[in-house]
Amino acid sequence: MPMISDGFYKNLLINRVRHSTRVPILPRVPDLTTPLVTKFEKWSGKRRKLFFQNESQIHSYGIKDFELSNNLFAQLLSSPMRSERNCKTKMPKEFLMQLKLSSTQNNDSSKSLGLAPVVQHSKLNKNSYVVNSRDILSQQISSSTKWVPIAALTSQMRFFQMQDVAIDKSNFLNKYEEMLNSLLRDRLISASASKLEPQDGDVIVRFDKDGNRPIEIGQCKSIGNKEVKAILTNLKYIGPTWEQLINEHRNHEEGIVIRFSENEEAVKLLYKMLAYHYTH
């Protein structure tokens, strides 16, 4: 067997260490250049928010004024979000019917509380929300006990049982329609007192027997036969009794002209009424 000298072993160890690549104990973290980090808002669905001190500053950047404060649909969509009790979906509350849980005023009733719809939303008492549709609610009225506000059911101060809540199922929708009809009539008659020439974005309330849409954006003639773009509504879809009101109180050849900036409540009530009758 050949003999290996001690010098050979020594040179082998020295050369091995000399030519080996040193591995750092803590590896260097590379710079974060991935678009998942640098372009976060593009893939995450998050939007960048721009903050302006006032409206004039917005215009100084060349951003167009869309006049959303006078736009019916923008105002409906910008209303606070609420959860609909039947499908548990959140949507702007202007698209929903508000229900209130309150003490009953009828001394003959054995129920201490009552759940009923209201036309004008408010923060008083405990509230819940359901879709503003006559057809849908008439199908779901049998299970209306689940419409009781969750805040009342989960409150530590709860003092009632479900059997203590009165829900007049037979007149539930009829009473709502009566309140809505009465309030809308008053607001339309009041709005008709203003003699307005249609402008872009105005609401025209008509009774068009030949019309095939309850609400649409269309052309309307103004001063000097100028064509303006307006929101055209048709009360034919609410009922025949509205024809007389339009004929008696029209303030324009097309019908009753309403300006959102001057009669916001009337316009929202009108949309609420059309949605109630036409949403399926």
From Swiss-Prot:
Its main location: mitochondrion. The keyword Metal-binding does not apply. Required for respiratory activity and maintenance and expression of the mitochondrial genome. Belongs to the RRG8 family. It is found in: Mitochondrion. GO terms for cellular component: mitochondrion. InterPro entries: Rrg8. It comes from Zygosaccharomyces rouxii (strain ATCC 2623 / CBS 732 / NBRC 1130 / NCYC 568 / NRRL Y-229). Keywords: Mitochondrion. It holds the Pfam family RRG8. This is Required for respiratory growth protein 8, mitochondrial. One of its GO terms (biological process) is mitochondrial genome maintenance.
